[in-house]
């Protein structure tokens, strides 16, 4: 059965997220490690976390995908912004130890005019600083759309980050500690043709990064055509991936959820819905396509 869910709010606690996930047919989900605008994190209630762990074990959930706030920019041109990202990421990873074996996804950041090479070096520095030997959380670099000066649009850029960590801190670079989250909207907006050549794109990922690094999928439709570098998510079937009137179609979505390189990974929806019913419908629909 396809492992799929959506972003859920931590407002009512960890166990409540698990109950909500079950209520909409999800067997994984994503959550922000703190307010998505950044700032301090709530104190952990370990009994609440244990309650979630019980739900995960009892319900046969796949791995969860914790998401760092969008405000983190470990390759910012501003030193204080970099320091904030490092401090918060380090704290996030320590807190994730209360829920071992899960995934921690973050946007690599934007170099803001320093250049891609400088941005990659700063991201490598950040990972070498915040990760620690023996951690039980796998850190994921998210594929980006290439908006502005974002780092991580190409598979080559992601590979360079991973290789940089492996060169400096090989004990932190195992596939159980450092990987990639593939966002379908982002890679399409970034220029990869997953509508007509998904097999070719996945073969390229394997050649450049290695499929063993791929740990999760953000499954989103896109409001923009391939190569737009916009990063504007659309509901499933409403955009350039799933809408036949825009050159996509159901066959594209089916190919994604059944692809041998993807089908066993946790899928997370980040589509624009106002209520959980929209996500429940997409979960059921995509699970039906997966067979």
Predicted feature locations:
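N-terminal pre-domain/capping segments
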Residues: 1-68, 72, 76-91
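Active-site beta-loop-alpha junctions enriched in small/polar residues
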Residues: 7-11, 34-36, 69-71, 109-111, ...
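Acidic (Asp/Glu)-rich catalytic clusters
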Residues: 19-25, 45-65, 90-100, 128-135, ...
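Conserved, mostly hydrophobic/aromatic
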Residues: 21, 67, 96, 104, ...
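Acidic/histidine-rich catalytic cores of soluble enzymes
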Residues: 29, 129-236
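Conserved active-site loop/cleft motifs that coordinate metal ions or position small ligands
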Residues: 30, 216-218, 264-271
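Active-site acidic/histidine proton-transfer and metal-coordination neighborhood
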Residues: 58, 74-179
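Short, electropositive alpha-helical surface patch
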Residues: 80-93, 116-129, 154-164, 199-203, ...
């Amino acid at each position: 059965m396809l492992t799929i869910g959506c972003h859920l709010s931590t407002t009512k606690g960890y166990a409540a997220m698990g109950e909500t996930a079950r209520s909409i047919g999800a067997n994984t989900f994503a959550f922000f490690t703190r307010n998505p605008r950044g700032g301090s994190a709530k104190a952990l209630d370990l009994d609440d976390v244990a309650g979630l762990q019980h739900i995960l074990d009892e319900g046969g959930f796949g791995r969860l995908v914790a998401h760092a706030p969008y405000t983190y920019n470990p390759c910012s041109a501003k030193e204080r912004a970099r320091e904030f990202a490092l401090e918060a990421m380090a704290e996030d990873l320590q807190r994730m130890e209360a829920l071992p074996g899960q995934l921690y996804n973050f946007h690599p950041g934007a170099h803001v005019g320093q250049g891609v090479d400088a941005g990659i070096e700063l991201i490598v520095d950040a990972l070498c600083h915040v990760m620690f030997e023996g951690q039980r959380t796998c850190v994921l670099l998210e594929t980006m759309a290439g908006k502005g000066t974002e780092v991580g649009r190409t598979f080559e850029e992601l590979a360079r980050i991973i290789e940089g960590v492996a060169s400096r801190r090989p004990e932190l670079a195992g596939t159980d500690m450092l990987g990639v989250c593939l966002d379908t909207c982002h890679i399409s907006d970034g220029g990869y043709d997953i509508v007509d050549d998904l097999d070719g794109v996945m073969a390229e990922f394997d050649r450049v990064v290695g499929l063993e690094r791929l740990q999760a999928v953000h499954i989103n439709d896109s409001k923009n055509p391939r190569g737009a570098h916009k990063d504007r998510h659309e509901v499933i079937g409403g955009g350039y991936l799933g809408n036949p009137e825009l050159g996509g179609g159901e066959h594209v979505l089916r190919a994604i959820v059944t692809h041998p390189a993807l089908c066993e990974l946790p899928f997370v929806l980040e589509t624009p819905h106002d209520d959980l019913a929209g996500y429940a419908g997409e979960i059921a629909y995509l699970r039906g396509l997966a067979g």
